[in-house]
Design a protein with these regions (language model features):
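N-terminal membrane-entry
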Residues: 143-162, 236-244, 551-579
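Short helix-loop junctions at transmembrane helix boundaries
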Residues: 214-242, 616-644, 649-659
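Interfacial "coupling" helices/loops that link adjacent transmembrane helices in transporter permeases
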Residues: 167-203, 578-614
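Selective transmembrane-helix segments that form parts of the transport pathway or gating/packing helices
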Residues: 5-12, 192, 196-217, 241-248, ...
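C-terminal membrane-exit region of the final transmembrane helix in multipass inner-membrane proteins
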Residues: 242-275, 642-669
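Internal/C-terminal transmembrane anchor helices
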Residues: 271-304
């Protein structure tokens, strides 16, 4: 049973890592080489100058340097290739960039030492001498990558459950072997030999697990065309996991040998164990298992809520498949931080965004990123607030006029015409009818919020005036949420604030000055053409169809839920193993006492009163800790019920077995 578990757990971990490496291959590659990331430069330098300097450096140190090149295909997806400096060859698994891609790419990128004697310090010094600043140095660290992949949320829970299961299986195995080992010990077998035999058996199981995991990893990398740099990650994961199991094996084998020495020889022949120590370990394991199930149920409830919130927008998104989001690169970030180039950059982007809006683009800016799953937030200006509060930071949706048409917001033609004719210094304030009596107050709040102020914020440069309109109550407004910060897709009866780029004149503003996750452009091909015409192509790192970003988030949520559920089943299976082991040991210690009490007429609960008391103590302690961790009483109650029922059923099952052995026990066996 233990060997089968070791093999299956290695298969599970390897399969998970194959999926991670497949979906984030560029991250695996980045973590496989010494790298320097460049974020800004303080002087102009040409591609040829960089190529000459890095070629020379690579040849001097007999090394190969690679620059990561990002290219965007016709569907807007990013592909990575590598420009090579030096006379060496590109490592297998990397795609060599074409000369055209190299010269069309930016200079602010990642530079890797792919092979050779070159050090990161020298490469960093060379890059800084070319005028590059704000460099970030990273060394390859497989174990850090493993911690990133396995040290979060559900993955960590599953790993702990695996370790607990292994402990339970070891105790069961050692319990069954105790009588045989006792006979061998009495026959003259030394304790070191007993320890050695135990370790050899466990090492054989773990070696088989490593071979299975690595073989599956190599086959998976080849079959699914995953980057070959995944193999060291999978190999390291398999070694690390099995070393953890080996540590547990050494620890329990050592305790096993000590227990043999501590127990009387006659007791050994009967298969007795030092039950106090082992029961203590099992109670601790049971407590951990209890807490793991609490966390599993809690996380499942959270992700179920997330899934419901996210899926609420599925139908709405399915009719909105051609909206495009733009992602910017490091060149954009560097120029935005540069005081000299910032003004020109702002003008360039304002012009592009205005053209994009005129060609069907849309602003839909919501406040959801500031609120938790319960719809609560703490704002530095407004204090504690709910998503349903009516203020500029809560139940407000900032949109362009075409949102009203796309989402069929109920307005008459006269109101639509008035909104479309908004001029400089004007915006539309669409209030649900239930807020009519608060019109003056809300008008003042939003006019003050949208007013353009100077850098110090104490003087209004441009006042903003609201045109007020009324819309129906009890409406849910689709917010086009494709960000992973929040999963909600609708706001209930929000105030709609209608804005146009021209509303702010030439002033810098928070809506139409820079790209954001709230600006959507119409059609992939049309957006690419606008980017080309606007002269901002060099700043774009990626075109994303918002619908597929949303679908990707749905997939990630599903995977997380399935991982949590799988972890939950494993946790329950582990707890059953622990309970079963405890009941075996419990009857081993108190078999005759239980039988005598049963003959005297005590019922089931009176017979096992001591056992139930300890279980209740575990439940109370686990429940208290679980309540502190989750603040969810129903989760703790449900877990206690599951564990309590599990305990009673296993105890009843074992009790029936013991009844069949009653005649043997009375004879003194």
């Amino acid at each position: 049973m233990k060997r089968l578990f070791v093999i299956l757990s290695n298969i599970f971990i390897t399969s998970f890592l194959l999926w991670i490496c497949f979906s984030t291959s560029y991250v695996v590659i980045h973590n496989s080489f010494p790298a320097i990331s460049i974020f800004s430069q303080n002087k102009e330098v040409s591609k040829d100058q960089v190529k000459y300097s890095l070629d020379q450096l690579a040849n001097e140190t007999d090394s190969v340097i690679g620059e990561q090149i990002e290219t965007i295909d016709d569907k807007g997806k990013v592909h990575f290739s590598y420009a090579i400096f030096g006379s060496g060859h590109i490592p297998n698994g990397l795609v060599k960039a074409s000369e055209e891609d190299f010269y069309n790419s930016g200079l602010l990128s990642n530079y890797y030492i792919l092979s050779g004697n070159l050090t990161l310090d020298r490469l960093n010094h060379e890059l800084q001498s070319l005028g590059f600043t704000q460099t970030f140095v990273s060394y390859p660290n497989i174990f850090l990558s493993l911690f990133t992949y396995m040290g979060n949320g559900s993955q960590l829970l599953v790993l702990v459950i695996f370790l607990l299961t292994f402990i339970a299986l070891m105790i069961i195995q050692k319990t069954k072997e105790m009588r045989t080992v006792g006979i061998r010990y009495i026959s003259g077998l030394h304790l070191t030999q007993i320890f050695g035999n135990s370790m050899i058996s466990d090492c054989g199981d773990l070696l088989l697990g490593i071979i299975t995991g690595v073989f599956l990893g190599i086959c998976g990398v080849s079959l699914f065309h995953i980057t070959p740099f995944s193999i060291p990650v999978i190999f390291s994961a398999s070694i690390t996991y099995n070393l953890l199991l080996l540590f547990l094996s050494i620890l329990f084998s050592f305790l096993y040998v000590l227990s043999i020495k501590a127990v009387h020889l006659v007791s050994l022949l009967k298969g007795k164990l030092p039950l106090k120590q082992i029961m203590g370990i099992l109670y601790l394991g049971q407590l951990v298992a209890f807490l793991l199930i609490v966390l599993t149920i809690y996380r499942t409830s959270i992700y179920s809520t997330i899934w419901q919130l996210h899926q609420a927008g599925d139908t709405a998104w399915s009719n909105q498949k051609d909206w495009v989001l733009l992602s910017t690169n490091r060149e954009f970030g560097a120029e935005a931080r540069n005081h000299d180039s910032r003004k020109m950059l702002e003008e360039q982007w304002k012009s592009f965004i205005e053209t994009g809006i005129q060609n069907g683009g849309m602003l839909v800016q919501h406040p959801l990123a500031s609120f938790d799953l319960k719809g609560l937030s703490s704002h530095p200006l407004m204090g504690k607030m709910s998503i349903n509060d009516y203020n500029p930071y809560a139940n407000s949706l900032y949109v362009t006029p075409n949102y009203l048409d796309v989402q069929n917001v109920e307005l008459n033609e006269e109101d639509k015409k008035s909104i479309n004719s908004l001029g400089e210094g004007e915006f539309g304030l669409l209030l649900p009818e239930k807020l009519k009596d608060q019109e003056d107050k809300l008008r003042q709040i939003y006019e003050d919020f949208l007013a353009i102020r100077n850098d110090k914020g104490n003087k209004i440069q441009q006042a903003m005036k609201a045109r007020v309109f009324y819309i129906s109550n009890n409406k849910k407004r689709f917010v086009y949420n494709s960000t992973p910060i929040s999963y909600q897709q609708f706001l209930s009866d929000p105030i709609l604030i209608v804005l146009k780029p021209s509303s702010f004149g030439k002033n810098r503003n928070d809506f139409f000055t820079y790209p954001s996750d709230y600006l959507y452009f119409k059609g992939l091909d049309a957006t690419k053409k606008l980017v080309e015409q606007g002269g901002i192509k060099k700043y774009i790192s990626q075109y994303d169809l918002a619908y597929y970003v949303y679908r990707g988030m749905s997939h990630n949520i599903q995977v997380e839920i399935l991982t949590i559920i799988a972890g939950g089943f494993l946790g329950i299976a582990t707890s059953i193993l622990l309970f079963n082991t405890m009941t075996i040991l419990y009857f081993e210690e108190f078999r005759k006492t239980i039988l005598i009490k049963k003959i005297s007429g005590l019922n089931f609960f009176e017979l096992h009163q001591k056992f139930f008391i300890w279980q209740i103590v575990i439940f109370i302690l686990g429940g208290a800790i679980g309540l502190l961790l989750t603040n969810k009483l129903w989760v703790v109650f449900l877990t206690s019920c599951v564990f309590g029922l599990n305990s009673i059923l296993i105890l009843m099952h074992r009790s029936r077995k013991e009844d069949r052995m009653a005649s043997i026990i009375l004879k003194g066996a």
